[in-house]
Amino acid sequence: MESKVEQGVKNLNMENDHQEKEEKEEKPQDASKRDPIVALPFEAGDYYVPRGGRRRFRVRQPIVHYRWDLMHRVGEPQGRMREENVQRFGDDVRQLMEKLRERQLSHSLRAVSTDPPHHDHHDEFCLMP
């Protein structure tokens, strides 16, 4: 009798173990069987931004970067803002701003005008006969 009872207990334990194993195997499958993300419908005029880890890229302005670099390139921290350093720093920033302004103007002028700069067209727009 005891052997039948022991066999029954063993069978129950084996069935429970088997069920637990099946449940553990089903959990990862459920994660992989998830429905794909469907775009939310939106009406005309509405703007939908998906939530999540969005990175915002900040464009650095070159002048600001140059100023920071120049400030930290100066010698020892005690002498960082002595008069000669301040004057040199101002001169460097002024030169960099002039270079940047020239480059920006050259690009904008190139985009606006296709005619060579030596032509003078002021008489073409004269309304006098």
Curated annotation (Swiss-Prot):
It is found in: Cytoplasm; Nucleus. One of its GO terms (cellular component) is nucleus. Residues 1-37 are annotated as: Disordered. Keywords: Apoptosis, Cell cycle, Cytoplasm, Metal-binding, Methylation, Nucleus, Zinc. The modification Omega-N-methylarginine is found at residue 51. Residues 15-36 have a biased composition (Basic and acidic residues). InterPro entries: BEX (IPR007623), TF_A-like/BEX (IPR021156). It holds the Pfam family BEX. GO terms for biological process: apoptotic process; negative regulation of protein ubiquitination. Primarily localized to neuronal cells within several regions of the brain, including the olfactory epithelium, bulb, peri/paraventricular nuclei, suprachiasmatic nucleus, arcuate nucleus, median eminence, lateral hypothalamic area, thalamus, hippocampus and cerebellum (at protein level). Zn(2+) binds at residue 126. GO terms for molecular function: metal ion binding; molecular function inhibitor activity. Belongs to the BEX family. Interacts with LMO2, possibly leading to regulate the transcriptional activity of a DNA-binding complex containing LMO2. Interacts with OMP. The histidine cluster (His cluster) and Cys-126 mediate zinc-binding. Regulator of mitochondrial apoptosis and G1 cell cycle. Regulates the level of PP2A regulatory subunit B and PP2A phosphatase activity. In absence of reductive stress, acts as a pseudosubstrate for the CRL2(FEM1B) complex: associates with FEM1B via zinc, thereby preventing association between FEM1B and its substrates. This is Protein BEX2. It comes from Mus musculus. The lineage of its organism: Eukaryota, Metazoa, Chordata, Craniata, Vertebrata. The gene is Bex2.
